[in-house]
């Protein structure tokens, strides 16, 4: 819950335990809160400007994480290119919209062990966090993971478990909490909104000479998974393509928006959307087929990524060939053929972009594997 300062609309400031939901609602309505307006910032670009309100007293600015990656000489690659294409791509915050809202049960047994039963996607980390919050040894905190009624990464962050545990300790009774859909939407983390500026240099035959990408993600008020998202975005920025010169910068920024957290494709979606969209634009300007420009630049077996990881097996070209055949692409894109989704019996096909990734020790390069 907020302490001294509320940083986003939807942040909890008080919790009430009652015999019924109706009584709890009446008790909540009786609480009167006086707010003192404070300067706020809702745009990541504005949050990085001199004089912008700093959200957290312990931090010198609103930057949560910056991940730089450098390979080769980007400016030289641009100078040698026949075509330079620069575009900006944005993605929005997205609600997880799982069927089951946040819910949990907490109780304290005769040995003083606090038990929380909840659909939790990050149970080990949350156990350690709760031990700190409750000022208890880890042996006195027990988490039980109930079946998860949909998560998609949205239940990796600890939003309500601390309140549950504290209420159980204060009341000495079991406490159950179930968010309404409105409470779930307003208070829980969303996918990181992003703005990506992508500049690419290519030869006339479609070979990519250089890539420069700057990704700014809105971490919201607390940036719950922002550091991990920024690392993954940087590692996967160039996609499964062999590019000799790469410059990538990913930035996570605090704002007074709803916190951003984990969502499926953890950090990969933002950069993949920009990269794949950009390749389509470049293919059109060069008069190349979208599948062909990807085949030209696709990594092969034994390729080394821009984070120095060697890939022993790369199936991209095989996947592209299979997708091209399955989509009937040789007859032209579906929209140019006048086909509808019902005619095709499937969605339009997009070439995939995916690599696994792990983070190595500080003295080693970030590596995708």
Q: Where do the PLM segments sit?
A:
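Structural alpha/beta core scaffold segments of enzyme domains
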Residues: 1-369
